[in-house]
Each structure stands twice: as C-alpha cells, then as structure tokens.
Amino acid sequence: MSFNFIKDKNKHIHFIGIGGISMSGLAEILLYHNFTISGSDMNSSPITKKLKDKGAHIYIGHKKENIKDADLIVYTAAIASDNPEIIEAKEKNIKLMDRADFLGDLMKGYKYNIAISGTHGKTTTTSMLSHVALKANVDPTILVGGNLDIINGNVRVGKSDFFITEACEYKSSFLKFFPYIGAILNIDADHLDYYKDLDDIKNAFSKFIKLIPKDGYLVAYGEDKNIQSIIKEASCNVITYGINSGDIQAHNIEYDEKACGNFDVVKNNQKLFSVKLNVPGKHNILNSLASICIGLASNMKDKDIIEGIESFFGTHRRFELKGCKNNITVIDDYAHHPTEISATLDAAKKYPHNKLFCVFQPHTYSRTLTLFDDFTKCFDKADEIILADIYAAREKDTGIISSDMLGDKLRDRGLKCTNFHKFNDIKNYLIENAKDGDLILTVGAGDIYKVGEMYINL
C-alpha cells in the first residue's frame, strides 16, 4: 500500500491516534491540502480541538463506526492489533498504513528532505534548524515532535521543495524515509524492547545512511564512537562536526549565567562566524553545530544561520522555564534516557540555584529495566532526587521493575532520594522542602510536568 499526494487527493483519510504529536502534524498537512480528514483518540486535547477547528472530524474513543467512510487508515506503532478500528478496517478491506510508511510516501513529494536522526536531541535540533530555514526564507514544510512558538505548533506547510522532519529509529521507522540530507546526532542504547542490542541499533543507522543519495549529505557528530564505526557506509557527501574534531567545530566556548554557550564556528581552522545560544548546555552546542552544518550544506547565508540559531529559545518541554514561585524556579525537561538526564542535569547545575531538586518519572517499564544500571548513575549532579511511579505509555506492568527499586539503588549509593506514588504528595513535599533560590527540575517523557504546574499554580 502506498500514498500519492496527487492520485489520492479526493480520498478520505482516517488517523487512529490523531492526538499524537506526529499524527496530528500529518493530519494538519493534509487538511491544508484540502483532504477529507477524520481521526480518533482516547482523549480530547488542545491538539484534537485545533484539528477540529481546521475541519477534521474527531472521535473520542476507538469504535468501528468511526471509520465507516474512510478510504485509507493511518495508525501508529502504539495502536494494538485488537483495536476495533483496525479490526473493522481489515474486515472491510479498507487500506491500512503505518505512520512511518505514510510519512515516507509524503516525503516523496519533496526534493530536499532533511531528516534529523539520533537517540537524543532530535526535536531540539529540528526546531533549531526550522528557525534557520525560516530566516533563510526557503519556505519549508516542517514536522517536529514538539510545539515550536515560531510556527505556532508542531507543523508548518510551506510551498517549496524543502521538508524538515525528525527521523525516529524506534521500530526502524526512519528506514522508510527518503532523506536528501540525513543527520545523525548520536547513537546510544535505547528502545531495547525492539532492538537486540547496541550493535543492532548501529546496524539500523547504517541502513539509514545508505538511504541518502550520492549527491546528498550526511551530517554526523564525528566524536561519537558509535557513529565513527558506521560513517564509512556513506556513499554521499559527509560533513562531520564536534568540539575538538570534525569539519565544523565550536571553539572558544564560553557560558553565560544561564549556561547558554557562546562560541566561534570554525572550518579548516578558519573562523566562519560567532554565535550566541539562548538554550543551555554543551548538548545544545552540539545540536546547533548540526543545524549549522545543514544550513551550510543547503547554501543558506551565514547571517541567516546566525539569526536562526540566536532567535531559538527552545521548544516546549525542552529545558522549559515553567515559572517561579517564592523565588523558586521550576524548569521542565523531556529527558527520559540516562544520557539525556545527565546532560540536562549538567545544564541545570550551571543555572543559578541553591539546591537542585530533580523530580523524575521513568518512562516505560522496558526502558527502566534494560537501562537500570545507567539510571542508577545519571542523577549524581542533583542535590535531591524525587521519583514518581513509572509512566507505562504503551506497556503493561509485569511487576518486574518499579520506581521503588530504582529509588532503593540510588539510596544505596548514598544519594538523597524519596519515592512518591501520587503527584499531589510530590507537590506537598516540594512546598515543605524547597527554599528561596532553589531549582525544581521535572524530568521525563510522561506527564511529570504536571507536578511543576501544580506547584506554580498554588
């Protein structure tokens, strides 16, 4: 089954899980092009309301009746095979497409597809690059995994041949894409509920590299040893970046009082220009270098690259300042992998504060189990750790792993750590223990941000 922008113009397309960040973006692109769109989700949300306002037919709850007029159904990996709409579609021979296949077919309508891959930093880098592309007036279509203020959401429909999107490796989704420029930000062990091991993950990224045409570009973090081992697979143009090595480097790095980096961009030991970031941490210096490399490969002007990078103040849920209460700062971050948590805490330590509270909600049982040892070692820079229960997402609790088990290990290592089972109890603990000048950092890919909002809105 395939999708064609022109041939399928009069089709009714139904999205199962339309409230998801990527699915809603795809639906919005099609609504712009006057497709008939419907979709279902378990809960109403600002996303479903926005789609409804744009003309989509939205159903809350999954029922077989929802797909009665659909010609094509798009679903995500999170949708189970016993979903009533999936079952009904099969019985009625309505065409079904996985989200990644659908996005891949959508990309065929564009010449300059830019796909940002990597275990960490995809949303931030895609968002940063979007700022650069908009400053350069290339009029791109953008699909990003977070809400970006400059496009008032997670999607923008342009009229040029530029398409900018994230390329997630989960279930090898990114192997269904058609990148002209493919970026690999880093490679780390993750999604081990799908991949066998790190070598299996590296093999998937090797295949991603081979998708890039000979006249295209691979942009890669050259100081990542896992990337170094597969970069030879490229038959296209290759641009590497890094702090101490690579084609494009960051020199003379200085951090301001909020941990945001200022640095010179250097190529072949020659300074190209300087930039001042408005997002914190070393990891965002690397994210900006990837964006700069793509901008240069796309023949964007230096001044547009600089303005794009410097106008980027972050996306929602990426080191997002939620507010202050009694001179106590609350920041939220989406980090859910040990490497991401370490980077986020490193940035937070550079941020002005007295005591750093890290409120963490583990994301999925499988990730917590497979990366358990790494989770026990990534919180050392926090002064105090508060653990919520594991956010299940698409999984079921088998009783094998829990937040309490992680808390026990952290306490065994001498770290101050407290477990709570209810958000309200976490809020009350913070009310009692956070003092003037402290920093509360909520961390996780689930709904832990609600704790910060509860605290701010007292």
Swiss-Prot record:
Main location: cytoplasm
Pfam families named in the record: Mur_ligase (PF01225), Mur_ligase_C (PF02875), Mur_ligase_M (PF08245)
Keyword Disulfide bond assigned: no
GO biological process terms held by the UniProt record: cell division; cell wall organization; peptidoglycan biosynthetic process; regulation of cell shape
Name of the protein this chain belongs to: UDP-N-acetylmuramate--L-alanine ligase
EC number of the protein: 6.3.2.8
Gene label: murC
Organism: Clostridium botulinum (strain 657 / Type Ba4)
Classification via SUPFAM superfamilies: MurCD N-terminal domain, MurD-like peptide ligases, catalytic domain, MurD-like peptide ligases, peptide-binding domain
Binding positions for ATP per the UniProt entry: G118, T119, H120, G121, K122, T123, T124
Gene3D superfamilies for this protein: Mur ligase, C-terminal domain (3.90.190.20), Mur-like, catalytic domain (3.40.1190.10), NAD(P)-binding Rossmann-like Domain (3.40.50.720)
Annotated localization: Cytoplasm
Reactions the enzyme catalyzes: UDP-N-acetyl-alpha-D-muramate + L-alanine + ATP = UDP-N-acetyl-alpha-D-muramoyl-L-alanine + ADP + phosphate + H(+)
Keywords carried by this UniProt record: ATP-binding, Cell cycle, Cell division, Cell shape, Cell wall biogenesis/degradation, Cytoplasm, Ligase, Nucleotide-binding, Peptidoglycan synthesis
GO MF annotations in UniProt: ATP binding; UDP-N-acetylmuramate-L-alanine ligase activity
